[in-house]
Amino acid sequence: MLRAIPRVANLEGYATGCKNALKETMYLSNWYDGGAVWNEFLMQRSFVSRYPVVKFQGCLGGYLGDAPGSMYFIEVKLNEFGEFFLFKHPAAFITIPYSLINGHYSHYTNILPHNLNEIIDALILLMNKPNASLDEILGIIKGPDFPFGCEIRINKEELYQIYMSGQGDIEILSHVLTNGSSVSISHYPPFIEEFGIDDYFDLKGFEQEFNGKFEKGDTVFHLQTNEPEALMKKMADSPILKRKVPIDFNFIVKREVKCVGIKRILSCFISNLQQQYAKRYEGCSPSEVNDMIIKEWEKIKSTFGDERRTTITIVK
């Protein structure tokens, strides 16, 4: 995708039609399933991807389930993140674990997105101290960080087990604001956009039972009723307010799909990166290679690092 968009647009910074970019992506990657490629494009929307590499122009749908427009009527171009890695600093793209910061979802794995600053700080820690404990790593990586913000409630021991084994479930909660007869729900759990909020909440039943009104915005869902407490009790178990999301750090290890912990993922990434830099810069000592890699990380962090959007609440 990164290489296809500028090839079709011909000039850096110009937008091109998604249909043309999709065809070029299929050609460069030898991928013949256009629907799957289009889904990969839609994964780069700002409310789905934590650090998208492209920017769209057109009707992209909404997080509450509104369908996107046709690819014929949507344009796409590289954003600052994508231009930095493709044009300004091509060597930097391999220096960060893209699947960890943006997440990766498939039949075999479910990696949730993480904060760029935290991942880079954990990489620097393991670079300088390879025998660092998982507790030290989790002192830096607080947990997943979603693009729309939300709240994660989890036990400290459960969080430790998830990142040690690479598998588990986390509970994600929306932000609910009650003001008199008005209830505003925002910062939803992830994957609501797959089906739409209508599939999780009976709007017609709400109007009849509570004699209320609803208003659906881009990111906020407003409910007007004279019985807000009864409404919240009925919605207590709704996926709109609370949802359990699985985590599976599945990777191919010696030709087998295995679930691995966060420390092994980061350590293997560092080892592979050191080998690549050693080949690229022959004659440099291991310490010089490490210094070059850390400088790349610091540059990426200072350019694109941001604050955590998801709140982590540790419960007993």
Which role does the model predict for each range below?
Residues H107-K316:
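C-terminal interaction appendages of subunits in large macromolecular complexes
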